[in-house]
């Protein structure tokens, strides 16, 4: 039975539980700069500690323990450690050349662990990136944008494709702050499904609401 069929069947019976936070849980491990570098070929001198997506390559044991802790607690769906694993966010660290490996290995790791528990699912996480299309990065020039839609779409396509190739059941556009960014994420997810022929992969979107009027950071409701 295809993942979509299993998910649909379970959703018709009960609420499925998604795992919890990744970043704050990783902080509890007390990792140092070396844990984020290890044998990676990185020319940048930027501090990498806190770039948690790198851990799927440098400390997969930590990410595996995190996945298992949520599955042991009863999660039906675990999320990959790929929240910032697209070229836009990784370029801030000089590690954009690693995004294909991060997404593929992150998906494979979560897939392997989920399969050990049986009837559990993997959501490939795609975060909002560090650039928003609805908001200028220059208060003096509100018409300016730090990135174009096409640039964002291409970065998301690259990420989504590797997540699907790595075996995720779901593509999760997570904590959306800007609906235009989310639109690019959904378009990229559809592209990845069509390109790989894995039409059973589901698409989910979660948004971060910042005030009582149900507005996201970019001001839309």
Residue ranges of predicted features:
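Domain-level signal for soluble alpha/beta catalytic cores
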Residues: 1-221
């Amino acid at each position: 039975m295809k993942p979509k069929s299993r998910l649909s069947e379970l959703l018709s019976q009960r609420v499925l539980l998604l795992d919890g936070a990744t970043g704050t849980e990783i902080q509890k491990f007390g990792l140092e700069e070396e844990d984020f570098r290890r044998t990676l070929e990185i020319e940048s001198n930027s501090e990498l500690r806190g770039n948690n997506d790198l851990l799927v390559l440098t400390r997969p044991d930590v990410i595996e323990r995190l996945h298992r802790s949520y599955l042991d607690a009863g999660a039906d769906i675990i999320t990959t450690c790929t929240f910032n694993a697209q070229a836009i966010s990784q370029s801030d660290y000089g590690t954009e050349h690693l995004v294909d490996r991060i997404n593929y290995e992150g998906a494979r790791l979560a897939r392997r662990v989920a399969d050990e528990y049986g009837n559990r699912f993997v959501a490939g996480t795609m975060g909002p990136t560090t650039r928003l299309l609805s908001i200028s990065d220059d208060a003096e020039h509100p018409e300016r944008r730090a990135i174009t839609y096409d640039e964002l779409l291409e970065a998301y396509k690259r990420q989504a494709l590797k997540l699907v190739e790595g075996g995720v059941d779901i593509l999760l556009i997570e904590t959306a702050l800007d609906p235009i960014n989310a639109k690019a994420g959904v378009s990229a997810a559809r592209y990845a499904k069509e390109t790989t022929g894995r039409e059973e992969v589901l698409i989910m979107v979660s948004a971060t609401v910042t005030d009582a009027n149900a507005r996201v950071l970019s001001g839309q409701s």
